[in-house]
Structure formats: structure tokens, C-alpha cells
């Protein structure tokens, strides 16, 4: 995507029109998202579609973002990976870890399901934070529309943007980006430590939320969410 990318002048108006036709309840949030991308077009994620990559910032792209913004908020069930297991893994488990042959198939299947569970935890974390933060003006950038940023907030009084990136673990691959430009710093936070049994909720940025965010509340949210979509 070229550095010269820009959004059309009536991008915010188009954003409202497109989202009104999809889900009017999201129109205000999506309009602010497009307002942000209009000011920082270089922060826009590269579309997967090659056709759309040549139309970034145009009306068709704004509609594409609107659909992605909406669809990514719909309930999503965990699904097992479709990849075929590597049989050499079974050999390693048997010889190096003394796993008996009769247990290998069960362990491989449990591993597949565990991977599916791990893959959705990051999404569940963002959904939980969206439920807690959006009532106070933060916007979940659902649909991976913004590079290295998961939540944005516009401070109208000071005409400033606040940006937040969240990760499930401290060893999750992080984007190297720490700023968009013009000293717009991306705040970063992770939920759990990979080398010790501890969470990081106490270090959630105070300037982002004064709500009582904690592991117990997050786990309750996850249970309720999953039960509803069974």
C-alpha cells in the first residue's frame, strides 16, 4: 500500500451511509474509525483482496471495511484446525516423552482442540474489553482495520487520538510499531505472563479505563459468551 494513500474527502459521510445500511447501531463507532483512518491513512491495514488494495480510501474500500467491522463482531464459535497432523510428532511423543502408542491418537486430537481454543482467546479478550471500554467512548477496531491497534479513542476537547494494542500473552508476537505519527503513541498491554502463573490486569493503563477489569470477570464473560453460542 502506497504511502501516498488517502481517503476521499467525504469518507466520514460515506462511512455512516454504508454502516446505516448494514447495522445502524455501529454507525457512530465506524464513522469515528474512518475519521481516524482519514487522518492517518498509513495506519490502515492492507486489504487481503488484491483488487481492494488498489482502492484503499475510496468508497468501495469504505464499504469493505464497514462489512468487516460488522461481521467481526458477530458471535463466532471455536472450530478445530483443518490442518493434517504431522505423523512425526507421534514418533517424538512416543520415543522422547514415553507416550504409549494407544494414547497417541487421543493426544493428537486433544492437541488440535487445544489449538482451536488458544486461537480464539485473543478474540474473546478483545470482545470483553469492547464490552467494558466502548460505553466510555473507546472503539474496538474489529475487522483488523488498523495496523498494530485494537482500540481507539478520540478526545474531542484536545483533538487527540488515544490508541491501545492488547495481546493475550507477553510472548505473543507484537508489532514493532509504537507510534503512528505526530507523537500519537500506541499504548500496549498484555493479559498473561508466559513464564509464570500470573496475570497483568493490575497494569492495565489507568488512562484507558478506571473500571475494575480482572481475570475473574474475564473468565465469567468467556463462559457466558461460549454458552450463548452453543
From Swiss-Prot:
Catalytic activity reported: Endonucleolytic cleavage of DNA to give specific double-stranded fragments with terminal 5'-phosphates
Gene Ontology biological process: DNA restriction-modification system
GO MF annotations, alphabetized: DNA binding; type II site-specific deoxyribonuclease activity
UniProt EC number: 3.1.21.4
InterPro entries associated with the record: Restrct_endonuc_II_SinI (IPR019070)
Record keywords: Endonuclease, Hydrolase, Nuclease, Restriction system
Enzyme class: hydrolase
Protein name, as recorded: Type II restriction enzyme Eco47I
Organism from which the protein derives: Escherichia coli
Taxonomy of the source species: Bacteria, Pseudomonadati, Pseudomonadota, Gammaproteobacteria, Enterobacterales
This protein's encoding gene: eco47IR
Amino acid at each position: 500500500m502506497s504511502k501516498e494513500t488517502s481517503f476521499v474527502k467525504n469518507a466520514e459521510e460515506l462511512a455512516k451511509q454504508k454502516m446505516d445500511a448494514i447495522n445502524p447501531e455501529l454507525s457512530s463507532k465506524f464513522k469515528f474509525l474512518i475519521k481516524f483512518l482519514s487522518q492517518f491513512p498509513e495506519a490502515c491495514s492492507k486489504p487481503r483482496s488484491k483488487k481492494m488494495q488498489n482502492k484503499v480510501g475510496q468508497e468501495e474500500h469504505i464499504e469493505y471495511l464497514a462489512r468487516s467491522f460488522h461481521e467481526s463482531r458477530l458471535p463466532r464459535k471455536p472450530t478445530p484446525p483443518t490442518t493434517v497432523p504431522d505423523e512425526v510428532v507421534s514418533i517424538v511423543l512416543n520415543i522422547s516423552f514415553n507416550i504409549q502408542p494407544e494414547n497417541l491418537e487421543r493426544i493428537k486430537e486433544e492437541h488440535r482442540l487445544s489449538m482451536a481454543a488458544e486461537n480464539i482467546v485473543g478474540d474473546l479478550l478483545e470482545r470483553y474489553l469492547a464490552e467494558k471500554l466502548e460505553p466510555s467512548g473507546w472503539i474496538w477496531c474489529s475487522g483488523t482495520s488498523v495496523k498494530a491497534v485494537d482500540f481507539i479513542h478520540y478526545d474531542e476537547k484536545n483533538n487527540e487520538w488515544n490508541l491501545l494494542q492488547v495481546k493475550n500473552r507477553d510472548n505473543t508476537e507484537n508489532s514493532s510499531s509504537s507510534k503512528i505519527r505526530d507523537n500519537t503513541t500506541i499504548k500496549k498491554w498484555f493479559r498473561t505472563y508466559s513464564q509464570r502463573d500470573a496475570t497483568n490486569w493490575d497494569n492495565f493503563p489507568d488512562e484507558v479505563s478506571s473500571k475494575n477489569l480482572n481475570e475473574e470477570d474475564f473468565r465469567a464473560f468467556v463462559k457466558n459468551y461460549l454458552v450463548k453460542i452453543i
